[in-house]
Design a protein with these regions (language model features):
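Divalent metal-binding segments
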Residues: 3-9, 14, 18-256
């Protein structure tokens, strides 16, 4: 008989099995479930080295199967400044400055989850707003849906799009009446020139289009990218995801 390495008991287990939708205990050996049932059924699988956890009535679910993920970009995103809940210049400016100071060699400071109404209801975010927050380092803010980004003046200049650029249908570098970019960039092709300023060179999102790095990454870059992927997987596991569907990729990512 195989003894359990782990037993969880006194739980409310949702089995997803129509024949037995609920149970109160389960046993694990190695990385596999070996039994699901009630306390009396599972107790006999305990050995002297079995870890026994009293769930105290808490719910236990099967691992979640995630349906659509971009793991490399998501792992990279864990390093970025999160702006969820940030409103107005008074809140934004100190966060951006601290982020810049903590990343002195980064070619582009990227912030995630920026509110479309960051500077107030109905007020379109512009490069001038971002220049007030941080004028001396390239900055780009991404909306939560990743369909819009906003960049400050120095970022637009270095990306070569301050005077605008031709874009595919559906993508736009939004222009002001004076013929200069406002800072609003609609869809990925519009903000891709700014993303290219990243110190990483954008290896983390090449898989969106199945592209490979133009120059083979060196050992240090590979180690950094492997760490990024590992951090992404650990983040998923911490929230109960045991399987994911990675919706982008290339041979470089596959090799990692």
């Amino acid at each position: 008989m195989t003894l359990a390495d782990l037993i969880i008991e006194n739980a409310s287990i949702l089995t997803m099995d129509t024949a037995r939708p609920r149970a109160t205990a389960l046993a694990v050996a190695g990385n596999r479930l070996i039994a699901v049932g009630d306390g009396a059924d599972i107790a006999g699988l305990a050995g002297p080295d079995t870890l026994r956890i009293n769930a105290q009535g808490c719910t236990v679910l099967p691992g979640f199967i995630e349906a659509h993920m971009h793991l490399f970009w998501g792992g990279y995103g864990l390093k970025l400044l999160q702006l969820s809940g940030v409103q107005g210049l008074a809140q934004l400016a100190p966060k951006l400055r601290a982020y810049a100071d903590a990343n002195p060699t980064e070619g582009l400071l990227i912030c995630k989850a920026a509110d479309y109404n960051l500077f107030g209801p109905g007020i379109a975010t512009t490069r001038q707003h971002l220049d007030q927050a941080l004028p001396d380092r390239p900055v780009m803010l991404l909306s939560s849906d990743h369909h819009t980004a906003w960049a400050n003046t120095i970022a637009l200049e270095r990306a070569g799009i301050l005077q605008g650029a031709d874009m595919p249908v559906g993508c736009e570098v939004v222009m002001a009446p004076d013929g200069m970019a406002t800072g609003e960039l609609r869809e990925q092709f519009a903000y891709a020139p700014v993303l290219a300023l990243r110190t990483s060179g954008g290896r983390e999102d090449l898989g969106f289009a199945g592209q490979e790095p133009a120059t083979p990454p060196n050992a240090a870059e590979r180690a950094e990218d492997l760490h990024t992927l590992s951090q992404g997987l650990q983040y998923c596991a911490a929230f109960g995801f045991t399987s994911i569907h990675n919706m982008d990729g290339n041979f470089y990512q596959l090799a990692l």
